[in-house]
Amino acid sequence: MNSKHIDLLDFSELPSAVYFRYADFNAHEYAAPHRHPWGTLEYAAHGVLHMDVDGSRFMSPPQYAVWVPPQVEHSFYSHQPVNYRAVCLDPKVCTDLPLRACTLAISDILKAILKDFAARDVKIPELDADQRLAQVLVDQLQQAPVHECYLPYASSPGLLAILETLQAEPGNNQPLAHWALQVHVSERTLARQFARELGMSFGEWRQRLRYLAAIEALETSRSVQEIAFDLGYSSGSAFIAMFARQAGCTPEQYRRSHLEGRKV
């Protein structure tokens, strides 16, 4: 399948201390590995970000954004359509932000400012009111809870093979005991490995994977029931309950808000 290259910003330094970028990427668009002297908050208002940042993989749903510090190499790929928003920050503005790439929880205030700026196509805050909002946004970023990664990956070959199989088949319902047999360890040992390397249980990791897969599936015309069965749920109601716990809304509500967001 052919992929389309995403154009990068064509200047060597930012035209303002805080600069905003907005785009709607279609499925199978990518930005090749690159780096720049400013820091960037990479955010998908709808869809899922797939990024490689300094050799680490990041996938983030709309409640989170990926923070890329200045001079850190990163690339981007969209498996499905993504409503993309980026906040580019001059290095002087980055001093109170993490030194390493990470995932930041996005507050409702930050979402609202980004939505407002995107609706008005504000790239450089020039009005006094917009400059104040931009400062509030920076303050929100500095206070945002830091997470290593929404869907972390393993370093050990055995565990990584399990994760990659599950990512290729998010509807796979095989229990932890099955995967323990595949890598020739006990179920208890594998459970400890999940906790040690990923910071979460097997069940939590698989649920997060399915949530990300659901967000991408909702970009298609498939029904909620079809998506539920594809992701291994025995009923639509079980899938809806999982999605609502993660997103704070039902799949249909998310889909409707996506259609509205694409109009922005």
Task: Locate each region found by the language model.
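Short acidic-glycine-tyrosine-enriched beta hairpin
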Residues: G55-P70
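Ligand-binding loop in jelly-roll beta-barrel domains
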Residues: Q71-C94, L99-A101
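Generic protein-terminus/edge-of-domain signal
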Residues: M1-V48, K263
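Amphipathic alpha-helical segments enriched in hydrophobic/aromatic residues interleaved with Lys/Arg
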Residues: C94-Q167
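…primarily DNA-binding HTH/wHTH and HhH modules…
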Residues: N2-H5, A241-V264
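Terminal helix-turn-helix DNA-binding modules in bacterial transcription factors
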Residues: A177, R196-I240, R256-V264
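Short hydrophobic/aromatic patch on the recognition helix
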Residues: Q63, L190, F194, A238-F239, ...
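Basic, amphipathic alpha-helical hairpins
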Residues: R120-P125, Q140-E148, I162-H178, F194, ...
